[in-house]
């Protein structure tokens, strides 16, 4: 099934999971370290430059951001985990919010876990993947920023990601800059939905 994105809009920004949209519209969530490229991925697959605000400053997304796609499903941008420069209390609040969302949200159809292709998965990446597996949530692992590496280096790095996360198959390779992986990602999204 081919997924064509004709319409995409920011539906809402939430700081509390009790405020999230009600109803049964399917949701696909994006999870990953701060600054891994979640906003850039949203903009690229929706073919919109500034739909999701991206920043070179880690920890820009501090809320759960809902994007309504084709009036049919939500893409949900979760706060990045990892090295955001915020207080311990703020990090704990984000963690609790994300954990509650992932464990309680009935509309959730799957999670796209993003990793920077240039770096070996860290402890938080491994914990996230294992936790999603424990919750039995379908996970698609996407290696972002592929344009930063040569084709040969890409293969080496995705093999490391696959081995470290103990994945049954290679992660999808994606670049918001070059457009590599866009169609493959849309096909994978269509399957999750």
Swiss-Prot record:
GTP binds at residues 32-39, 59-63, 77-80, 144-147, 174-176. InterPro entries: G_ENGB_dom, GTP-bd, GTP-bd_ribosome_bio_YsxC, P-loop_NTPase. PANTHER family: ENGB-TYPE G DOMAIN-CONTAINING PROTEIN, MSS1/TRME-RELATED GTP-BINDING PROTEIN. It comes from Syntrophomonas wolfei subsp. wolfei (strain DSM 2245B / Goettingen). Its cofactor is Mg(2+). This is Probable GTP-binding protein EngB. Residues 24-193 form the EngB-type G domain. PROSITE patterns: G_ENGB. Mg(2+) binds at residues 39, 61. The keyword Methyltransferase does not apply. One of its GO terms (biological process) is division septum assembly. HAMAP family: GTPase_EngB (MF_00321). Belongs to the TRAFAC class TrmE-Era-EngA-EngB-Septin-like GTPase superfamily. EngB GTPase family. Pfam families: MMR_HSR1. GO terms for cellular component: cytosol. One of its GO terms (molecular function) is metal ion binding. Keywords: Cell cycle, Cell division, GTP-binding, Magnesium, Metal-binding, Nucleotide-binding, Septation. Necessary for normal cell division and for the maintenance of normal septation.
């Amino acid at each position: 099934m081919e997924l064509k994105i004709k319409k995409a809009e920011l539906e809402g920004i939430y700081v509390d999971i009790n405020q999230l949209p009600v109803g049964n519209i399917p949701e696909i969530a994006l999870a990953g370290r701060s600054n891994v490229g979640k906003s850039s991925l949203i903009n690229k697959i929706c073919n919109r430059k500034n739909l999701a605000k991206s920043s070179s400053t880690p920890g820009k997304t501090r809320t759960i951001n809902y994007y309504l796609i084709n009036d049919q499903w939500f893409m949900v941008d979760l706060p990045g985990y990892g090295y955001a420069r915020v207080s311990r209390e703020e990090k704990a609040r984000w963690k609790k919010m994300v954990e509650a969302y992932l464990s309680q949200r009935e509309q959730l159809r799957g999670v796209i876990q993003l990793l920077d292709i240039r770096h070996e998965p860290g402890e938080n990446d491994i914990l996230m993947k294992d936790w999603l597996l424990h919750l039995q949530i379908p996970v698609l692992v996407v290696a972002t920023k592929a344009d930063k590496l040569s084709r040969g280096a890409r293969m080496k790095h995705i093999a490391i990601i696959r081995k470290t996360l103990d994945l049954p198959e290679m992660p999808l390779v994606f670049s918001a800059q070059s457009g590599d992986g866009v169609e493959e990602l849309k096909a994978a999204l269509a399957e999750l939905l």
